[in-house]
Amino acid sequence: MPGRAPLRTVPGALGAWLLGGLWAWTLCGLCSLGAVGAPRPCQAPQQWEGRQVMYQQSSGRNSRALLSYDGLNQRVRVLDERKALIPCKRLFEYILLYKDGVMFQIDQATKQCSKMTLTQPWDPLDIPQNSTFEDQYSIGGPQEQITVQEWSDRKSARSYETWIGIYTVKDCYPVQETFTINYSVILSTRFFDIQLGIKDPSVFTPPSTCQMAQLEKMSEDCSW
């Protein structure tokens, strides 16, 4: 998605985005401990809204967006944020409906709409149960620290990982997800300002202009 990364198998880019790009794209209570005291993946919240900053190696840019994540219904909405005036930069809204297998791209200014097929299956924004625990540490300084855990898809058969996820120990909120290929970062997404729940479920409903949507993705620059 214009938000999340490729599936944890790293592949073609959820550049269907999302969270484009999208798809870099979790939340519970204290991670439970196994019989030998080894940390276990926590359960991330399934419905929340927040903001994200996503870096894509292909473009060399950071993009900011508002994010609505509904894991229960397998849908995501990403709304590009304008933080500075960039000539010929178009802002879009992306609505990804995985149960229907479609993604809508809507121009925020004109409401022009594109409808595309989602070729990748739903990949929840969370810590897979077969993940490898890497580390636990604090972010910030005295009186302002947040304890997080770092997980990856590294296995004993190989020494490196292609996915790294950082989540808070308390409430299991996503902090950052990073995808790599051959030791190079291809996609990295940071999450912040998270609020539980979906304030307005209608954000997942495409506008009426999508009833006559074109079938090709719109360009992000001025080449209309």
Curated annotation (Swiss-Prot):
Ubiquitous. Detected in brain, heart, skeletal muscle, kidney, testis, ovary and prostate. GO terms for cellular component: extracellular region; lysosomal lumen; lysosome. Residues 1-37 form the signal peptide. GO terms for molecular function: calcium ion binding; ganglioside GM1 binding; identical protein binding; phospholipid binding. Glycans are attached at N130, N182. GO terms for biological process: cell-matrix adhesion; myofibroblast contraction. Keywords: Disulfide bond, Glycoprotein, Lipid-binding, Lysosome, Secreted, Signal. Its main location: other. It is found in: Lysosome lumen; Secreted. It comes from the Eukaryota. Disulfide bonds join C42-C172, C88-C222, C113-C210. InterPro entries: Ependymin, Ependymin_CS. N-glycosylated; the glycan contains mannose-6-phosphate moieties. Belongs to the ependymin family. Binds anionic lipids and gangliosides at acidic pH. Homodimer. This is Mammalian ependymin-related protein 1. It comes from Homo sapiens.
